[in-house]
Amino acid sequence: MIAGGTGGANTVTGKWFEVKTDLKTALTKAGYDLTNFQFCRQYDFPSLFKTKTGEKMEDLFGKKFLPDEAVIFNNTLYVIEKKQQGGGGSVDEKIQTGPYKLAIYQECAKRMGLANAYYLYLLSGDYFNVPKFTKHQIPYLEQFGIRTYFDQLNLAEIF
């Protein structure tokens, strides 16, 4: 992100994409009972991790990890990173970090007493659903079990 908050989710389109793709709203509209879902976003996740483990993320991993959305359901941690892009930029390379972040969140899940962790990307289709990504980067992510979705999650497939 650029100093002063002009990149990432601080852009108008980035914030709009995050609101448009809100997980809790999508689950509610799809008729899911949210009783057994525990939701958190960005800065809430390190606090949840510390509450469940007594450990600070930055002490274990050198920094806090701030997922766009995370949910615990059925003894599993689901981390959803959302990327919206209107033109070329650093987000092109950010999705390549998925395998590293998956390993971090799997360790978080283990320490939180959860059975597993999944790392998912929710990408804006108008930018990412093109051969540049679908022929190279997305198959690479899939090798690690990282699922990618365009514009909306397939809730039935995930939950």
Predicted regions and their residues:
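Active-site metal-binding core of divalent-cation-utilizing nuclease and nuclease-like domains
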Residues: L34-N74
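Charged, structured surface patches that assemble and position nucleic-acid processing machinery
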Residues: H136-F159
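Hydrophobic alpha-helical packing residues
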Residues: L23-L34, L141
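Residue-level detector of short coil/turn "hinge" positions at structural boundaries
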Residues: L34-N36, N116, T148
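Conserved long hydrophobic alpha-helices within structured protein cores
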Residues: D33-Q42, D92-Y100
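Nuclease catalytic cores
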Residues: M1-T28
